[in-house]
Amino acid sequence: MILQRIKSPSDRTNGILTLPDGSEYYSLERPWLNNQTSISCIPAGHYKFARDTHGRFQWFEVLDVNGRTNIEMHLGTKPSHSEGCILLPKVCLIAMKNTFYNDLDLTYVLEIRNP
């Protein structure tokens, strides 16, 4: 799965998330503020993600983000809905659920690319 960040206003980080079946959805994150906890998007890179069964929103959790914990992919429509997480529309989360939710023990790969 690939999250391609695109040129964005200074108050947010916009992106396009492409699922394995080729479907694309817009994403929204906080702006880049040097990976500061709760106020910055996470660095570009390769991450594992898994079904989230204990977090606040319980959709998906991005794992092993250097210097950060509790990074989730969840529903949201504006940067203030995030504390460093990746916000996605409900239709995307449902598509991800149908693709990735079958096995609690599996992890998957998310590649985040900067513009």
Residue ranges and their predicted role:
Residues M1-P115:
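Cell wall/extracellular polymer interaction/catalysis modules
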